[in-house]
Amino acid sequence: MTHQQMLDLIQQLNDYSYAYHVKDEPIVPDAVYDRDYRQLQSIEAEHPEWIQADSPTQRVGEKPDSGFTNVAHTVPMLSLDNAFDNESLADFDQRIRKLLNAEQVTYCCEPKLDGLAISLRYEEGRLVRGVTRGDGLSGEDITSNIKTIYSVPLKLRTKTPPAVLEVRGEIYMPKEGFEKLNALAVEQGEKTFVNPRNAAAGSLRQLDPKVTAKRPLVMCAYSIGYVEGWEQPESHYAGLLQLSEWGFRTNDLMITAEGAQGCIDYYEKLNEKRASLSYDIDGIVYKVDQIALQNQLGFIARAPRWAIARKFPAQEEMTRILGVDFQVGRTGAITPVARLEPVFVGGVTVSNATLHNKDEIARLGVKVNDFVIVHRAGDVIPKVVQVVIDKRPENATEVVFPEACPVCGSDLEQVEGEAVIRCTGGLVCGAQLKESLKHFVSRKAMDIDGLGDKLIEQLVDQQLVKTPVDIFTLSEKKDTLLSMERMGQKSVEKLLASIEIAKSTQFNRFIYSLGIREVGEATARALTSYFTELDDLMAADQETLVEVEDVGPIVAQHVRLFFDQELNRDTIKGLLAAGVVWEKKQQVSADELPLSGKTYVVTGSLSQFSRDQVKDKLQALGAKVSGSVSAKTDCLVAGEKAGSKLTKAQSLNVPIIDEAGVIALLTEHGAI
């Protein structure tokens, strides 16, 4: 790289930094900044004579914007150096042990929350100031906004507070609050936020505290920055426990770990849990736990020597849109999917990302050949969340939405008030038929083992299956099945046996398998609890349907429309004629069921039953089964490797039972 190219790289990094730290409007993902920053570090190491005074390696951050009063930090809020793999983390541990002449070092390990760093100053136990990190030396006084956040104590919960206490923490927005905030923005025709961090930053820097007060912000303390008139605990971890006693929220996933291997184990464990957490984290912070050792190690130019951050695989990356394809879903929904230059994000290589619908394309202003930000977290489908307008090429072209179904050529329709455009072809459309069949045989529907996606596509393409009824006649086409790809004698026999077993099902699973729009598992269960006879359900008008718990006017309309269609009624008759049956249950009022009004959460690995089976049995006894633990949870069923849900239940004093306990409960009430 030439000297001029390095100067250009410095300018680019400074532009990124200004947008991120000053304007709170990131223009590239953290991973892009980190990659370019490491490149600059490498160049400066080779050519120290090229180092510039304005290089981001020579400073902490940017000067704050002029919208708020500037306040100096008593102790600088420095950045952290980064470890990017196990090897660099082990190198960090080796350096620490060498400097301390120690065989083993204990570290405090904490999730790195993806929010906005702040410093809170308390005098005689009362909050007097809240300041953003800013450039690390000074930040913006946002005290009025900070006071609107309920997780920030206005007064310490102690009769003997320190004379002065400065607490460092992170302001963030939980995922659920972010989704609700964006949904409200869409409803009101306002601009949506790109991600929870962007939403938290924008909310915290409102000039009107009343606006901030309406935003679902949370503050989590992560260190003591400065103290007078109080003897600080000997360890960082003990200090956080003390902050918790004084009324601060701290992260319940923080632990202490021994040596590099303990830190690596924690990283792997938390990386697995990352997607299931209720808030975003982008890595882990490791700190030497003993305060005396921290003081002994001291600081380097821009960071403490005793701490390091390790990032998770990036959940957002920048890439280019090569084109847009249009997929047809089970209910006919036309979904635009961006074809991308392959990019590594969220731990995998991504080459496609959803654009959701026509309205989302317009909202993003996305064009073919645009550079975009792609987001992927856990098992969530990758999506385009932002267009990098500054990098738009001259050959960018508009995305043209099809005027007819791209699969079957049928007309498209858009119901007033809905963003989704749908194909009107129904099961005549090959794409809808394939997706409907995949849903019909899925584990939570008819549960036909051995009938996977690829086999379904082959069966439809060869016109062996045209409706769900045809699945139950496959025994008559055994020779044809044997001639198909990867279908040997044992595979065919196993498939046909599974189809035969699936004929004996449950009423709620049968209704769910039909794929009625807006009818998920819970709604199917509610409908079949209210209507114990299929004929009664099929004949119910909308006024009767809305009497069912959790069934509103829209769901009732879709149920009625489904049963009004002759093709659907013929399919149901065909399935019953093919031998599909279920045990009829006596109608019982929900209030009469033994677990009525109770909320259960099931987590971890179970040996005698699957989690879904336990959930079904609990719901059959009247319980509500939730996917997350809260103060309203009545009981957690915890199997092996229960993880964060168990930790949260323990912190909330939620009753916990193991697999033996839930089996005893189900046995007591005759569910097994």
Swiss-Prot record:
Species: Marinomonas sp. (strain MWYL1)
Reactions it catalyzes: NAD(+) + (deoxyribonucleotide)n-3'-hydroxyl + 5'-phospho-(deoxyribonucleotide)m = (deoxyribonucleotide)n+m + AMP + beta-nicotinamide D-nucleotide
Required cofactor(s): Mg(2+); Mn(2+)
Listed name of the protein: DNA ligase
Binding site for NAD(+): D30, A31, V32, Y33, D34, S79, L80, E110, R133, E170, K287, K311
Record function comment: DNA ligase that catalyzes the formation of phosphodiester linkages between 5'-phosphoryl and 3'-hydroxyl groups in double-stranded DNA using NAD as a coenzyme and as the energy source for the reaction. It is essential for DNA replication and repair of damaged DNA.
Domain of life where this protein originates: Bacteria
CDD domains in UniProt: BRCT_DNA_ligase_like, LIGANc
Name of encoding gene: ligA
PROSITE patterns in alphabetical order: BRCT, DNA_LIGASE_N1, DNA_LIGASE_N2
